[in-house]
Amino acid sequence: MTVRRATIEDAKEIFAIEMDCFSVPWSLDSIETELMNQEKKLYYVIEDTEGVVGYAGAWLVYDEGQITNIAIRPSARRQGFGATLTRALIEECFKRGMHEIFLEVRISNLSALSLYRQLGFTVKGMRKNYYSEPKEDAYIMSLIKEERK
């Protein structure tokens, strides 16, 4: 299992993961745009022996990180890829001076909620009807650098 910074060459693999994981995936153009300008953005991929199995990204805004996506191929879930990838993203955000990291998660995504809580995230609020297809609320979660586990 290897975590590394994503490059533009990873765009098609990331797009394939988006298609596998999300009901409303980002377009290939959007992914390429994100990967081309990583000064205020961080994108990582995680690989196994067969290639990229997941990716995660965050936007860096002043002293806050906003996790945009964390996605692991369905066939690679429950093997530690998500935790390893998310920890790497968190560490880099804090290394770059972020004080707090935010994310949104479907209230029904119990696996992700469990992982985020294990990593020290806490629920700060809710966004009504944040997701579409299916329509669902999102929890807003955050991790403060000084309070992390």
Summary of predicted features, one role per range:
Residues 1-3:
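Extreme N-terminal starter segment of soluble prokaryotic enzymes
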Residues 86, 109-112, 129-134:
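Short glycine/proline-centered loop/turn elements that form peptide/ligand docking sites
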Residues 135-149:
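Terminal substrate-recognition subdomain of acyl/acetyltransferases
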Residues 104, 117, 122-139:
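Conserved catalytic-core motifs of GNAT/GCN5-like acyltransferases
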Residues 67, 101-105:
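Conserved hydrophobic beta-strand within the GNAT/NAT acetyltransferase core sheet
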Residues 73-79, 107-109:
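Active-site acidic-Proline motif in GNAT/NAT acetyltransferases
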Residues 5-75, 86-88, 92, 96, ...:
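Acetyl-CoA-dependent GNAT
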